[in-house]
Amino acid sequence: SKAEIRKNPAYLFASIHYLLDTTRGKKITVMLPYSYRLKDVSDWFRQLWAESLGKKVDVDGNHVHLGQTPVNALGATDQHSQIQLYVEGPFDKLVCFLETEKFNADVTIPEGFEDHPGISYLSGHTMANLLMTEKSGTEHALVINHRPNMTIRLPEVNANSVGQLLYMLEVSTAFAGGLYRVNAFDQPGVEFGKQYAYAVMGKQGFEKKKAEFEQTKLPPRKVL
Protein backbone atom coordinates (compact mmCIF):
# COMPACT_ATOMS: atom_id res chain seq x y z
CA SER A 1 0.00 0.00 0.00
CA LYS A 2 3.05 2.30 -0.15
CA ALA A 3 2.42 5.41 -2.25
CA GLU A 4 6.04 5.66 -3.42
CA ILE A 5 5.95 3.38 -6.39
CA ARG A 6 9.53 2.10 -6.11
CA LYS A 7 8.76 0.85 -2.59
CA ASN A 8 5.41 -0.68 -3.50
CA PRO A 9 5.81 -4.50 -3.53
CA ALA A 10 2.88 -5.01 -5.89
CA TYR A 11 4.34 -2.61 -8.47
CA LEU A 12 7.84 -4.05 -8.07
CA PHE A 13 6.53 -7.57 -8.68
CA ALA A 14 4.64 -6.41 -11.78
CA SER A 15 7.47 -4.32 -13.20
CA ILE A 16 10.09 -7.04 -12.70
CA HIS A 17 7.91 -9.49 -14.62
CA TYR A 18 7.07 -6.96 -17.33
CA LEU A 19 10.64 -5.82 -17.91
CA LEU A 20 12.15 -9.31 -17.90
CA ASP A 21 9.45 -10.45 -20.33
CA THR A 22 9.67 -7.54 -22.76
CA THR A 23 13.42 -6.84 -22.64
CA ARG A 24 14.99 -10.18 -21.69
CA GLY A 25 12.64 -12.72 -23.24
CA LYS A 26 11.51 -14.32 -19.97
CA LYS A 27 8.24 -15.69 -21.31
CA ILE A 28 7.74 -18.14 -18.44
CA THR A 29 7.29 -17.27 -14.77
CA VAL A 30 7.66 -20.02 -12.18
CA MET A 31 6.20 -19.71 -8.68
CA LEU A 32 8.08 -22.02 -6.33
CA PRO A 33 6.89 -22.12 -2.68
CA TYR A 34 9.10 -23.80 -0.09
CA SER A 35 6.17 -24.58 2.18
CA TYR A 36 3.48 -27.13 1.42
CA ARG A 37 0.93 -24.80 3.01
CA LEU A 38 1.66 -22.25 0.26
CA LYS A 39 1.23 -24.75 -2.58
CA ASP A 40 -2.31 -23.60 -3.33
CA VAL A 41 -1.07 -20.01 -3.69
CA SER A 42 1.05 -21.01 -6.68
CA ASP A 43 -1.88 -22.95 -8.18
CA TRP A 44 -4.12 -19.89 -7.77
CA PHE A 45 -1.51 -17.48 -9.13
CA ARG A 46 -1.13 -19.57 -12.28
CA GLN A 47 -4.82 -19.01 -13.03
CA LEU A 48 -4.73 -15.32 -12.07
CA TRP A 49 -1.70 -14.37 -14.18
CA ALA A 50 -2.68 -16.44 -17.23
CA GLU A 51 -6.28 -15.39 -17.70
CA SER A 52 -5.72 -11.76 -16.71
CA LEU A 53 -2.72 -11.00 -18.94
CA GLY A 54 -2.82 -13.46 -21.83
CA LYS A 55 -4.49 -11.23 -24.41
CA LYS A 56 -4.85 -10.92 -28.19
CA VAL A 57 -5.45 -7.16 -28.30
CA ASP A 58 -4.31 -4.21 -26.19
CA VAL A 59 -6.44 -1.33 -24.93
CA ASP A 60 -5.93 0.49 -28.24
CA GLY A 61 -7.22 -2.44 -30.27
CA ASN A 62 -3.81 -3.49 -31.59
CA HIS A 63 -3.17 -7.21 -32.02
CA VAL A 64 -0.38 -8.02 -29.57
CA HIS A 65 -0.79 -11.70 -28.57
CA LEU A 66 1.14 -11.35 -25.32
CA GLY A 67 1.33 -12.86 -21.86
CA GLN A 68 3.78 -14.86 -19.78
CA THR A 69 3.14 -18.54 -19.19
CA PRO A 70 2.86 -19.17 -15.42
CA VAL A 71 4.15 -22.47 -14.05
CA ASN A 72 3.59 -23.72 -10.52
CA ALA A 73 6.03 -25.91 -8.64
CA LEU A 74 6.75 -27.00 -5.05
CA GLY A 75 10.01 -27.04 -3.15
CA ALA A 76 11.75 -29.24 -2.41
CA THR A 77 9.71 -31.82 -4.37
CA ASP A 78 10.28 -30.25 -7.77
CA GLN A 79 14.02 -29.92 -7.27
CA HIS A 80 13.97 -33.47 -8.59
CA SER A 81 11.69 -32.84 -11.57
CA GLN A 82 11.88 -29.23 -12.80
CA ILE A 83 14.94 -27.47 -11.38
CA GLN A 84 17.33 -29.11 -13.84
CA LEU A 85 15.42 -27.37 -16.65
CA TYR A 86 15.40 -24.02 -14.85
CA VAL A 87 19.11 -24.08 -14.03
CA GLU A 88 20.52 -25.35 -17.34
CA GLY A 89 17.69 -25.12 -19.87
CA PRO A 90 16.55 -22.20 -22.05
CA PHE A 91 17.05 -18.67 -20.71
CA ASP A 92 13.32 -17.95 -20.81
CA LYS A 93 12.24 -18.15 -17.17
CA LEU A 94 11.87 -16.01 -14.06
CA VAL A 95 11.61 -17.94 -10.79
CA CYS A 96 9.69 -16.50 -7.84
CA PHE A 97 10.30 -18.28 -4.52
CA LEU A 98 7.80 -18.17 -1.68
CA GLU A 99 9.16 -18.84 1.81
CA THR A 100 8.17 -18.43 5.43
CA GLU A 101 10.34 -17.31 8.34
CA LYS A 102 8.45 -19.50 10.80
CA PHE A 103 6.95 -22.95 10.44
CA ASN A 104 3.96 -23.80 12.63
CA ALA A 105 5.46 -27.19 13.41
CA ASP A 106 9.02 -28.42 13.19
CA VAL A 107 10.80 -31.70 13.77
CA THR A 108 14.39 -32.25 14.84
CA ILE A 109 16.19 -34.97 12.93
CA PRO A 110 17.27 -37.53 15.56
CA GLU A 111 20.72 -38.94 16.17
CA GLY A 112 21.54 -42.21 14.51
CA PHE A 113 23.03 -43.87 11.47
CA GLU A 114 26.53 -42.89 12.58
CA ASP A 115 27.91 -45.56 10.26
CA HIS A 116 26.27 -43.86 7.28
CA PRO A 117 27.98 -40.50 6.72
CA GLY A 118 25.74 -39.81 3.75
CA ILE A 119 22.85 -39.09 6.14
CA SER A 120 24.32 -38.91 9.66
CA TYR A 121 25.41 -35.30 9.14
CA LEU A 122 21.74 -34.29 9.25
CA SER A 123 21.39 -35.31 12.91
CA GLY A 124 20.42 -32.41 15.16
CA HIS A 125 19.15 -30.22 12.35
CA THR A 126 15.46 -29.44 11.99
CA MET A 127 13.30 -30.26 9.00
CA ALA A 128 12.62 -26.54 8.55
CA ASN A 129 16.35 -25.84 8.47
CA LEU A 130 16.83 -28.61 5.91
CA LEU A 131 14.03 -27.31 3.69
CA MET A 132 15.25 -23.72 3.73
CA THR A 133 18.82 -24.85 3.08
CA GLU A 134 17.52 -26.71 0.03
CA LYS A 135 15.88 -23.46 -1.09
CA SER A 136 19.12 -21.51 -0.60
CA GLY A 137 21.01 -24.10 -2.61
CA THR A 138 18.53 -23.88 -5.47
CA GLU A 139 18.62 -20.08 -5.36
CA HIS A 140 22.42 -20.12 -5.50
CA ALA A 141 22.42 -22.53 -8.45
CA LEU A 142 20.09 -20.20 -10.36
CA VAL A 143 22.22 -17.14 -9.63
CA ILE A 144 25.48 -18.85 -10.62
CA ASN A 145 23.88 -19.85 -13.91
CA HIS A 146 22.54 -16.32 -14.56
CA ARG A 147 18.87 -17.22 -14.07
CA PRO A 148 16.78 -14.34 -12.64
CA ASN A 149 14.90 -15.10 -9.46
CA MET A 150 13.18 -13.31 -6.62
CA THR A 151 11.85 -14.23 -3.16
CA ILE A 152 8.65 -13.28 -1.36
CA ARG A 153 9.09 -13.95 2.36
CA LEU A 154 6.17 -14.29 4.77
CA PRO A 155 6.69 -14.02 8.56
CA GLU A 156 4.53 -17.14 8.94
CA VAL A 157 1.72 -18.91 7.12
CA ASN A 158 -1.58 -17.75 8.59
CA ALA A 159 -4.78 -16.09 7.40
CA ASN A 160 -3.34 -12.59 7.82
CA SER A 161 -0.11 -13.11 5.89
CA VAL A 162 -1.64 -15.23 3.14
CA GLY A 163 -4.48 -12.72 2.74
CA GLN A 164 -1.94 -9.93 2.30
CA LEU A 165 -0.01 -12.03 -0.22
CA LEU A 166 -3.12 -12.76 -2.30
CA TYR A 167 -4.12 -9.10 -2.28
CA MET A 168 -0.62 -8.03 -3.29
CA LEU A 169 -0.64 -10.46 -6.22
CA GLU A 170 -4.07 -9.23 -7.34
CA VAL A 171 -2.95 -5.59 -7.26
CA SER A 172 0.26 -6.58 -9.03
CA THR A 173 -1.74 -8.22 -11.80
CA ALA A 174 -3.69 -4.99 -12.27
CA PHE A 175 -0.42 -3.03 -12.41
CA ALA A 176 0.93 -5.50 -14.98
CA GLY A 177 -2.16 -4.97 -17.11
CA GLY A 178 -1.35 -1.26 -17.16
CA LEU A 179 2.28 -1.89 -18.08
CA TYR A 180 1.32 -4.25 -20.91
CA ARG A 181 -1.60 -1.96 -21.86
CA VAL A 182 -4.16 -4.75 -21.78
CA ASN A 183 -7.44 -5.15 -19.91
CA ALA A 184 -6.59 -7.41 -16.98
CA PHE A 185 -10.23 -7.73 -15.96
CA ASP A 186 -11.78 -9.73 -18.78
CA GLN A 187 -11.28 -13.19 -20.27
CA PRO A 188 -12.63 -13.06 -23.83
CA GLY A 189 -10.76 -16.20 -24.84
CA VAL A 190 -12.49 -18.18 -22.08
CA GLU A 191 -15.89 -16.71 -22.98
CA PHE A 192 -15.32 -17.59 -26.64
CA GLY A 193 -15.11 -21.29 -25.83
CA LYS A 194 -18.01 -21.11 -23.37
CA GLN A 195 -20.31 -19.61 -25.99
CA TYR A 196 -19.71 -22.53 -28.34
CA ALA A 197 -20.34 -24.97 -25.49
CA TYR A 198 -23.61 -23.20 -24.64
CA ALA A 199 -24.64 -23.31 -28.30
CA VAL A 200 -23.91 -27.00 -28.82
CA MET A 201 -25.76 -27.89 -25.60
CA GLY A 202 -28.81 -25.97 -26.82
CA LYS A 203 -28.85 -22.93 -24.55
CA GLN A 204 -31.42 -20.39 -25.67
CA GLY A 205 -30.02 -17.31 -27.37
CA PHE A 206 -26.97 -19.05 -28.85
CA GLU A 207 -28.55 -20.33 -32.07
CA LYS A 208 -26.25 -18.25 -34.29
CA LYS A 209 -23.21 -19.56 -32.45
CA LYS A 210 -24.43 -23.12 -32.98
CA ALA A 211 -24.77 -22.54 -36.71
CA GLU A 212 -21.32 -20.95 -36.77
CA PHE A 213 -19.89 -23.92 -34.87
CA GLU A 214 -21.46 -26.45 -37.23
CA GLN A 215 -20.17 -24.59 -40.29
CA THR A 216 -16.61 -24.44 -39.02
CA LYS A 217 -14.38 -26.86 -40.88
CA LEU A 218 -11.81 -28.33 -38.53
CA PRO A 219 -8.88 -30.31 -39.90
CA PRO A 220 -9.26 -34.10 -39.59
CA ARG A 221 -8.02 -35.43 -36.28
CA LYS A 222 -5.99 -38.57 -35.86
CA VAL A 223 -6.42 -40.75 -32.80
CA LEU A 224 -3.05 -42.01 -31.62
For the regions a language model picked out, list residue spans one by one.
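Active-site phosphate/pyrophosphate-binding segments
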Residues: 1-96, 101-104, 189-224
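Glycine- and acidic
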Residues: 1, 26-34, 63-68, 116-124, ...
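Helicase-primase coupling helices
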Residues: 65, 71-157
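N-proximal short alpha-helices
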Residues: 11-14, 18, 22, 111, ...
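Short acidic, glycine/serine/threonine-rich loops at helix termini
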Residues: 42-45, 107-110, 164
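Short alpha-helices
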Residues: 129, 133, 144-195, 202
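Solvent-exposed, flexible loop/coil residues
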Residues: 45, 57, 75, 90, ...
